[in-house]
Swiss-Prot record:
Xref: NCBIfam families: psaA
Function text: PsaA and PsaB bind P700, the primary electron donor of photosystem I (PSI), as well as the electron acceptors A0, A1 and FX. PSI is a plastocyanin-ferredoxin oxidoreductase, converting photonic excitation into a charge separation, which transfers an electron from the donor P700 chlorophyll pair to the spectroscopically characterized acceptors A0, A1, FX, FA and FB in turn. Oxidized P700 is reduced on the lumenal side of the thylakoid membrane by plastocyanin.
Catalytic activity: reduced [plastocyanin] + hnu + oxidized [2Fe-2S]-[ferredoxin] = oxidized [plastocyanin] + reduced [2Fe-2S]-[ferredoxin]
Cellular compartment(s): Plastid, Chloroplast thylakoid membrane
Subunit and partners: The PsaA/B heterodimer binds the P700 chlorophyll special pair and subsequent electron acceptors. PSI consists of a core antenna complex that captures photons, and an electron transfer chain that converts photonic excitation into a charge separation. The eukaryotic PSI reaction center is composed of at least 11 subunits.
The species this protein was found in: Arabis hirsuta (Hairy rock-cress)
Gene: psaA
Protein name per UniProt: Photosystem I P700 chlorophyll a apoprotein A1
Length: 750
């Protein structure tokens, strides 16, 4: 008699038709909340409607229902992303000079927007070269399209239609997985399955398919383009895929097919999977064969990683076990209980993801210029500056978001009763030590970094250049950074034997790459000026962290307000009758953190913009002499505050200020308008609620006199609403001002 183990029963992971689709309900504003659904009594109603529409925690306390709403919303988000992408590709297909740019990327600028002449604004259509008039774009899409092997506007058009189909599909999926087949809570909490699928599927197969596309489509097409073949003469992508002989003409080892792979003779593939380092001298971008190799390697790693976790079969890691095994000599219970936190609090999960993704986005910003991945990207200075600035801002916002959701987790999801002596509890118990030390670090960095500048301004004002901190007087060389640069410059042939050049030209080593008479990249010298501004970076980053971390660690309680958790995530003050307790909510810390994030990122992008114009970007003469855009003035000018104001902000603002009457005039208008938006924010930040309520009541009196008073009572913004409106306009105005300043400058001189 054979005893079989009982067959595991198949788990039912979805509920069928849980919630009916009702247009009547959707049409009712505030249907998710009993209070808001009643309709407006006062104008505060519209603010509450916006504040709570996506705060799913406030609609219900059922974790399964919250999870389904978040999951469904993600499909809506993906749908919008596909719609946006489709629009980008459609503009490339319908309104752009892509084919002209492809034939001569060094002399023709990218443009995908032509302004219609309605009130004379066709002045904005500048001459981008090749007889095309339009607005110069700085998104880098042209460079990506070339790298992926797109050779005609018809291909862009087809891709745009494909993206629309996917947008519709995602919209349908969002509806289907909420109204027709909604996953159960257990499905959302099955982290091992999620990790396996995300690692092996999204990252593994995603990278593998991209590597395949690069080898079979991008590489051959780019090889033809680099050789100067007319895009119309190049075979179409499907011809390369279906006809191996075509590829074998370019890469002879293709004739052998998969034999070298199975016989472990992998070096045969080194024609199209390379490890060269450095930049392709024709395009100024990374070698596309290096990139294909990289994606293949990444794919292997993630396909392996996607088989690491224990699911239906009893092998592999369990995440709970891994976390609970993490105990050090100083960490008490270690990560015990972390598994439960991350599977029951999506805020905690989101917080970690935002912190990682924000940091990664900033890493991307730094790699886009130091290892420019796409052809002709490095010499398109406006695009380089835009990509750096964009990724820095996005990274900053994501990191502040991480702190926001960590604080929401602390207020709404943290259960102190069953958390004892684990890592989080231990951090909370010595939060005073953490915050006071961090505060000391901020004061130290602030006084010393700013003090160096003040010293230099004073010496400069007194006419004592020999007593300044500079490369020509008292040197403060960044010796550690220079050592790291040098190590990387020496790496090829030593630590990485197969490599012919270092990972980035910025490390050093002497060689520079120029494309079409413009510098793509060269070794970036670091000196006293960089040492000074890097300490300002350290200062602003630490202050941002201080504010955000204080908000998280004191979100539930503090000496001032021991019962803070009961007041919620955002509240103006601890009730009337307790003075000095305003602006202590977790939300207020996020609010204040945003201003310091703005400070920090502004200094970074100013540093980048000036440093690149001074020491990297420029033109090269026939004799090989490089002339930089601002003639290398960074090292001597940026060491005083006065220098930053005079030689960077003022000197480089001339293009945007003098843009009227030219194709850059829109930037001049934006520069003006965004300053106005920024100034408008101060009205919300520097005035009180009572002032406005008094004003409103006299205006209501006038309406009553004329018998035109509205049924909905006007109310002044609450304290929190006023600060939210204020910080929004502050950031929007500041970012748009910087954008206009940067682009008018770099399009004019780059």
């Amino acid at each position: 008699m054979i005893i079989r183990s009982p067959e595991p029963e198949v788990k039912i992971l979805v509920d069928r038709d849980p919630i009916k689709t009702s247009f009547e309900e959707w049409a009712k504003p505030g249907h998710f909340s009993r209070t808001i659904a009643k309709g407006p009594d006062t104008t505060t109603w519209i603010w509450n409607l916006h504040a709570d529409a996506h705060d799913f925690d406030s609609h219900t306390s059922d974790l399964e229902e919250i999870s389904r709403k978040v999951f469904s919303a993600h499909f809506g988000q993906l749908s919008i992303i596909f719609l946006w992408l489709s629009g980008m590709y459609f503009h490339g297909a319908r309104f752009s000079n892509y084919e002209a740019w492809l034939s001569d990327p060094t002399h023709i600028g990218p443009s995908a927007q032509v302004v219609w002449p309605i009130v004379g604004q066709e002045i904005l259509n500048g001459d981008v070269g090749g007889g095309f008039r339009g607005i110069q774009i700085t998104s880098g899409f042209f460079q990506i399209w070339r790298a992926s092997g797109i050779t005609s506007e018809l291909q862009l058009y087809c891709t745009a239609i494909g993206a629309l189909v996917f947008a519709a599909l995602m919209l349908f999926a969002g509806w289907f997985h909420y109204h027709k087949a909604a996953p159960k809570l257990a499905w959302f909490q099955d982290v091992e399955s999620m990790l396996n699928h995300h690692l092996a599927g999204l990252l593994g197969l995603g990278s593998l398919s991209w590597a395949g596309h690069q080898v079979h489509v991008s590489l051959p097409i780019n090889q033809f383009l680099n050789a100067g073949v007319d895009p119309k003469e190049i075979p179409l992508p499907h011809e390369f895929i279906l006809n191996r002989d075509l590829l074998a003409q370019l890469y002879p080892s293709f004739a052998e097919g998969a034999t070298p792979f199975f016989t472990l003779n992998w070096s045969k593939y080194s024609e199209f999977l390379t490890f060269r380092g450095g930049l392709d001298p024709v395009t100024g971008g990374l070698w596309l064969t290096d990139i294909a190799h990289h994606h293949l390697a990444i794919a292997i790693l993630f396909l392996l990683a996607g088989h690491m976790y224990r699911t239906n079969w009893g092998i592999g890691h369990g995440l709970k076990d891994i976390l609970e095994a993490h105990k050090g000599p100083f960490t008490g219970q270690g990560h015990k209980g972390l598994y439960e936190i991350l599977t029951t609090s999506w805020h905690a999960q989101l917080s970690l993801n935002l912190a990682m993704l924000g940091s990664l986005t900033i890493v991307v910003a730094h790699h886009m210029y130091s290892m420019p991945p796409y052809p002709y990207l490095a010499t398109d200075y406006a695009t380089q500056l835009s990509l750096f600035t964009h990724h820095m801002w996005i990274g900053g916002f994501l990191i502040v978001g991480a702190a926001a959701h960590a604080a929401i987790f602390m207020v709404r999801d943290y259960d102190p009763t069953n958390r004892y002596n684990d890592l989080l509890d231990r951090v909370l118990r010595h939060r005073d030590a953490i915050i006071s030390h961090l505060n000391w670090v901020c004061i130290f960095l602030g006084f010393h970094s700013f003090g160096l500048y003040i010293h230099n301004d004073t010496m400069s004002a007194l006419g004592r250049p020999q007593d300044m901190f500079s490369d020509t007087a008292i040197q403060l060389q960044p010796v550690f950074a220079q050592w790291i640069q040098n190590t990387h410059a020496l790496a090829p042939g030593v630590t990485a034997p197969g490599e012919t050049a270092s990972t980035s030209l910025t490390w050093g080593g002497g060689e520079l790459v120029t494309v079409g008479g413009k510098v793509a990249l060269l070794p970036i010298p670091l000196g006293t000026a960089d040492f000074l501004v890097h300490h300002i970076h350290a200062f602003t980053i630490h202050v941002t962290v201080l504010i955000l971390l204080k908000g998280v660690l004191f979100a539930r309680s503090s000496r001032l307000i021991p019962d803070k958790a009961n007041l919620g995530f955002r509240f103006p003050c601890d009730g009337p009758g307790r003075g000095g307790t305003c602006q202590v909510s977790a939300w207020d810390h996020v609010f204040l953190g945003l201003f310091w994030m703005y400070n920090a990122i502004s200094v970074v992008i100013f540093h980048f913009s000036w440093k690149m114009q001074s020491d990297v970007w420029g033109s090269i003469s026939d004799q090989g002499v490089v002339t930089h855009i601002t003639g290398g003035n960074f090292a001597q000018s940026s060491i005083t505050i006065n220098g930053w104001l005079r030689d960077f902000l003022w000197a480089q603002a001339s293009q945007v200020i003098q843009s009227y009457g030219s194709s850059l005039s829109a930037y001049g208008l934006f520069f003006l308008g965004a300053h106005f938006v920024w100034a408008f924010s101060l009205m919300f930040l520097f005035s009180g609620r009572g002032y406005w309520q008094e004003l409103i009541e006299s205006i209501v009196w006038a309406h009553n006199k004329l018998k035109v008073a509205p049924a909905t009572q006007p109310r002044a913004l609450s304290i929190v609403q006023g600060r939210a409106v204020g910080v929004t306009h502050y950031l929007l105005g500041g970012i748009a001002t910087t954008w206009a300043f940067f682009l008018a400058r770099i399009i004019a001189v780059g």
